[in-house]
Structures are given as C-alpha cells and as structure tokens.
Amino acid sequence: MATISEREATQVEAANAGGRTPVVFIHGLWLLASSWQRWADLFDQAGYAPVLAEWPDDPATVEEARANPDVFAGKTVGQVSDHMADVIGVLNKKPAVVGHSFGGLIAQNVAGRGISAATVAVDPAPFKGVLPLPIAALRATLPVTRNPLNRGRAVTLTPDQFRYGWANAVDPEEAKALYEEFHVAAPGLPIFQAAIANLNPGAETRVDAKNPDRGPLLIFTGEKDHAVPPAMSNAAYKKQKHNPGVTELAEMPNRGHSLIIDSGWREVADKSLEFVKRFA
C-alpha cells in the first residue's frame, strides 16, 4: 500500500473489515476527494462502504490545497489511473466506481481493466477516440491550453472562469459559494493529454471499451455543461454501448459541470445509487 495515502488506507481497511461492497469515488480536476462527502454519506446509509480516492499527493483540505497549489502540478491521467487500480487492488471485494469529469474518464479506464463491479461516469472527460470538440469545451479549457507552459504547472481558475466552465447552470450567488467551498488548483497536463489523444498512439487517456469484463456502465450528461458538453458524453456512450455489458445514458436537463456538488447533487447521486444497487 506504498502508493496509497493514509486517508485512503483507513477507508480501505474499514471497507475490508466491514464486509460491505465498496464504492470508490474519483474526483476530477479542480476538486478534492472531500467534494464527494455528501455522496459518501448517502452511499454509506444505503449499505455501501465509501472510499474517497485521491490523486497522488492530494492535500487533505481545500485550505491546504490553496496554501500549496504547486503540489498538483505534473500529474498525468496514467499515473492517476494506476493509482486508482492500486486502491482497488487492496479491497477485498470488487467495488463500484463513481467518477466525475477526469474522474469519470479514469473510472472508465478502471472499468476497462475489469476491476469494477459497476461504473458511473458523470460528465466524463473524453477518452481517446471521442471526437467531438465543441466550442464551449474549447473555451472552458482555455485557461489551461492558452499557455503551453501550463503542461507542467498547476492552474487555478478565476471565479469568472469557474462560472463559465463549471457553474453556468446555477445562479451567480451559488456559483460564488461553490468556488469558495470547493475550488482548488489542478494540473494542466491532463487537459493537454486529452487534447492530443487522438493523435497519440500511446495516449494515456485510452479506455478499453471492448473488454467483456468491463461491467455495467452509466454515463451522465448535463445539458448545459460547458466543460464536457453533451456531444462529448454522447460520443463516449456510443463507443461504450458496443460492449456486451449494460451501458446506459442519463441525460440531465438544465445541469452544468457542477452537478455533483451544486444544490442539485442529490438527483444525480440518487440515480447513481439506483444504478449501483442493480449490479453491486
């Protein structure tokens, strides 16, 4: 368990000791594992053992993250995917996996390895082979991509950038509150990895959508998401639905990229829980 944080190890040990089916939650860029806490409480009450997985070197709190933003720099999709596989590898039971944004991409990578009992990908970042690139997504990622040096940096969004890419479907007051409560810096590198994936034969954003052991998969798409517009989630679904496992798409009207943390989080969480209950 050398690569697993003390916080993750504590949750893994509790899951193994209790014998309940684990649910591994994977956050994406600009959030921490703690952003899943309300989801974790809901799944815990439903009889599951939540594991709030972290990206390598993640600080414990938003305050710590803001005090040391450079700790996020340089993390890659491959590193994080392998880390999640390490976390799952020390669980006694095959878990369900829930991920958002780049966490949703990584959740699909994990599922493609055959180590997830059921997978939920909420507005997932595109994996290699997902071709649509809407203008809204280009604008949402511009704070990173406009400077090639951001490949090796951690990038913090301004409130206006967060409002456009994440919180465009909520009112300005809620957008401000979400930024203050949840937003932290994020590595720029995963954005660049996704941007050039279709030109890179060895792209770390690849997903094995054909593996018959992938298991059931639910993909969410928020109608108003600027960071991952519906065209991208729909394209991921079309590639995944050829898998022999159950593959479903949940369309969420009037929802943006903040749908797992904003005031409407419970609707998404309840649908995710219903799906997981069917298979894990």
Residue spans for each PLM region:
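Gly/Ala-rich beta-loop-alpha elbow adjacent to hydrolase catalytic centers
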Residues: 98-103, 107
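Active-site glycine-rich loops that stabilize anionic/oxyanionic intermediates
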Residues: 28-31, 101, 223-224
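Catalytic active-site module of serine/aspartate enzymes centered on a nucleophile-bearing elbow/loop
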Residues: 2, 246-280
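Flexible "cap/lid" loop of the alpha/beta hydrolase fold
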Residues: 116-152, 192-199
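Short beta-strand/loop motif that positions the catalytic acidic residue
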Residues: 213, 219-221, 225
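Conserved alpha/beta-hydrolase "acid-adjacent" motif
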Residues: 226-235
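Conserved acidic catalytic loop of the alpha/beta-hydrolase fold
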Residues: 78-95
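Short, surface-exposed "cap/lid" segments of acyl-processing enzymes
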Residues: 16-64
